[in-house]
Structure formats: C-alpha cells, structure tokens
C-alpha cells in the first residue's frame, strides 16, 4: 500500500491514532487513542474527493434501505464514555446511527453497519474538528428566554431548572411553582431551541402540592433555603420523588436555622439527591456544606462563578448574593448572611475537589450568580488552572491529559444526564441517542463552538454576513439555523417531564408540539454511577479557619491572576 507522512496525512484527513491536539491556548493536550475508520478509503466530501456518485456514495440504495441523513467525516470525538477517538459519525432520524467507518460498502471495505452514504446523505467535514456531546446545564433560573441563545453559543443545548421569568422568586430559586405556572412554562418553552426540563417547588410537608406538580410535568423538585430548606421539607420531597421517579435538588440552609449539615445529611436518609452549590459560595450550610460531597447518595454539583478560582472571585460574590436573594445592604443581618457565604478556603477547595472527581457536575446558576454562556469555557479554564496548580493526574498517561479532559467533559455532559434521568436520550456520543452534538475548532475548544447540531439538524452556528458571496466573510455572529426554525424546532427539541405527567396526557392537555419524553431511573442511582467523577473521600472543614481537608490533606490552591482562553478570545 502506498504510504504518506504522518504530517501529510493529518493535513488531508486530520489527526489519527497517536497524534496530539492542543486545546485552545491551554496547556491541555489530548491524544487520539484509536481510529475506527481504517486507512486508504476515508470518506471525504468535496471536488475530486471520495464521497461522489458510485464511489464513496452508493447510488442505488434509497433512504428506506437505511442510508444516512447526515455524516460527519473523519472527526475527533471527545466523549466521557468513548474516550478520545477518530471516526465518522452517522446521523439518521435525528439520532446517532453509527460511529466508525462510513461510505459505500459496494466499493469500500470495512463500512460500519448502518453507516451507508448515499443520495440521501449530506456531509459535514470533520477532518480538523472535535466533536462532543452537547452540554447540559442542570442549574437554570428561567429568568429570560434569551438565555437559550447564549447557552447555545457556548455549546449547551439542554436546560434543567425552574422559574417563570424575572420574579424575585425566580431570581433567587430555580422553581416553577404549581400546576398553572408549570403548564404556562411548558407552553412557553415550545419556542426555545434547547431541550428543557422544569423543576417544581419541593418545599412542602403536604403530599398534595408535591404530587400535583409531578402530574403537571416537572422532572424534579427543588428544595431551596429561600422557601425554607427544612429537614421535613427534604424528607417529604424525597419520599414523593421516590414514588414518581424524579430527582430532588437542594440548596441547603446557609443560616443553619433548621439544623446543621449533619441534620440535612440525616434528612436525606440515604436517598439519592442532587446538591446544588456543594461548595457553599452560592449558598448552603455555612461553612461546611462541602462535606456532603463525601456521601455516596449525594450527586454533587457546583456553579461557574467560582470556577476557576480567581483573584476577583471573592469580590464579585457579595453583590451577586445581595441581588439574587432580595437582601438589603442597610440591614446588618442581611450583610452577615451574604458575607457568611464568601469563604476563599472553601472556594479553593471546590476547585481541587472538581479536579479530584469529588464534585461531579458543573452548571451555571444562570443570571442568579452564574453565567449561562460560559460553562464549557469555565470547565476548560478550571482544568487548565488545576493542571498548573496540581500537576498531572495519576490517571493520565505520560504524554497527554486525556483523563483530566474527559473528567471535566463528563461534568457537563453524561453526569447531569444520569442525574436528571435522561442519559437514555442525551449526554454522550453513543449510537441510538439523540444527535445533540457540538463541533469545535480545536483552537477555540471550550470557548466558541463552530456549530451546534440539535436532534440531527444544525440549529446554531457561527455564520458570516448572509449577504456575502460566501458563508465566511465578517461580521461572523452566532445565528439561529434552520434546525431552530418553524416546526423543525419542535421535531429536534425535547421537553422532559415525569412519567406521571406523560401518563396523564400532559402533551395533549398542554397542547405541546415538541417531543415529550419522560425521565427515568432518577431514584436508583448513586455517585458510583457518575462517570469519572465518583470519588467519596472523607472531607473535614475547620470551623474557625474554614480550611478543607480531604482524607487528612489540606485541599487548597492559589487564586489565578490570568486564565486561559480569556481576553485574547473575546474582544471588547
């Protein structure tokens, strides 16, 4: 077989096994672990290339014969479950149909089952791109619908959260309370080009108010201190969640009015729960809520304002807290409440615990102390800062950072999918799942996606002047694409609900046109099910200094003065 140099091959078909890719301007390098395509018969679109009639594209088989709708050729996949691999990705009926070698089995060897390219197939050239699952943000305050556009512009295509717009309750808590509000929000999100699951109010001792929200369509209960995060409220929310198989998320009691962190852990009664603000800067038992991350039944997340820990993190938190939680700077008790959350020691420990795989998920807390359009960016910045502070992870190979990168990718893809009961639909690049995918230029990985594929259609992309002679001339903006338009939006986006709501006919009763899918397996999971982030060490917090020890070792880092992928990526 004729041979070419590795450099020439990479120029034609992109990197292959053993090649390394730098991510943005970080010091993070991934290495392709395996290539599923084979060499010599690569599928390539374009003039004089292989995906032409009778060559790589079959000219006899119809779509009814299983031909792909879309193929992404020669792309580098970065996925928490698959690893870092090179492959073609086939899409059909809005789902991932195959990962491997695409083409025409009539003239090509080794074409993967279900990955035939034909007349019905369009192509995206992935030769010099990275493909990930689209991000999932599990901590959304539904304050403004425009959040969806900013999230898509950073590669996030699924929201879990609550609210009804800019009410004070929504500004402070991720809650859509009661059946009427839930119904209206289900109808409103029909026009959003992202998947959405709504959280109801879990602060109730009564069974009735909890059950009616599950039947109305929520995918979980949120117990928030602003509504009273008492032990009894937690117990009742968890019991009802067990009954209807939905998740419970908690923002615990910062003031320790109703008990301490030990009392809250006791109220969990060993049942599965998603803890928001596990670090405590965004709220929760002061100063030691971070201890819950050691519990096997706790699925811990934290939010992006303190990730990575920077020299300005502490200063900006105070004003955030005052605004979000309706506090008065002229009331000493309100000021003390805000100040109790701002603890540099626990913020530093939060960063370290993410790097160790102890805090398992990463979310935004959109417009309520966090930035909805910065999740992927903050994840890569944090991973890079932790490599600089802590060195290579023991799990990483000598020449790459694959494990660390995949650990952080899991925090915004598969782990929130598992936690919210939707990993059978989204969260990873796996055959059979909805084709919610993001393509990145490696130079902008984590900062600026090239395009977002939603349910098999491109619904968001960096696009040049629509009046230009090419797609590329400036000004290049993120713009909605055809997948986010008309009735296709409903076909390519999902509204997640409880099984109780689906059984009650919520789709018909609320007049929903989108796909409506029930969450499942929310109550039988534990931290052991979370990918690459399942560690449960002993965590202690000094009540005087707030120093955090993990298995007896002080967990801390210095705040960074500069971050990767920062000002040089964002002018203005």
From Swiss-Prot:
One term under GO cellular component: cytoplasm
The text of the family note is: Belongs to the metallo-dependent hydrolases superfamily. Urease alpha subunit family.
Task: Write down the CDD domains for this protein, in alphabetical order.
Answer: Urease_alpha (cd00375)
Entries under SUPFAM superfamilies matching the protein: Composite domain of metallo-dependent hydrolases, Metallo-dependent hydrolases
Species of the source: Yersinia pestis
Record note on quaternary structure: Heterotrimer of UreA (gamma), UreB (beta) and UreC (alpha) subunits. Three heterotrimers associate to form the active enzyme.
Residues recorded as binding Ni(2+) 1, renumbered to this chain, are 139, 141, 222, 365
Q: Which residues form the Urease domain?
A: 134-572
Please list the residues that bind Ni(2+) 2: 222, 251, 277
Q: What is its EC number?
A: 3.5.1.5
Modified sites of kind N6-carboxylysine: 222
Q: What cofactor does this protein call for? A: Ni cation
- Alphabetic keyword roster: Cytoplasm, Hydrolase, Metal-binding, Nickel
User: For this protein, what reaction is catalysed?
Assistant: urea + 2 H2O + H(+) = hydrogencarbonate + 2 NH4(+)
Among InterPro entries, the record links this protein to:
Amidohydro-rel (IPR006680), Metal-dep_hydrolase_composite (IPR011059), Metal_Hydrolase (IPR032466), Urease_alpha_N_dom (IPR011612), Urease_alpha_subunit (IPR050112), Urease_AS (IPR017950), Urease_asu (IPR005848), Urease_asu_c (IPR017951)
Q: Where in the cell is it found?
A: Cytoplasm
Residues bound to substrate: 224
Q: Name one GO biological process term.
A: urea catabolic process
The protein's matches in Pfam families, at most eight in alphabetical order, are given as: Amidohydro_1 (PF01979), Urease_alpha (PF00449)
Q: Metal-binding: is it a keyword of this entry?
A: yes
Q: What is this protein called?
A: Urease subunit alpha
Q: Which HAMAP family match?
A: Urease_alpha (MF_01953)
Any one GO MF term held by the record is: nickel cation binding
For this chain, the Swiss-Prot or TrEMBL PTM comment says: Carboxylation allows a single lysine to coordinate two nickel ions.
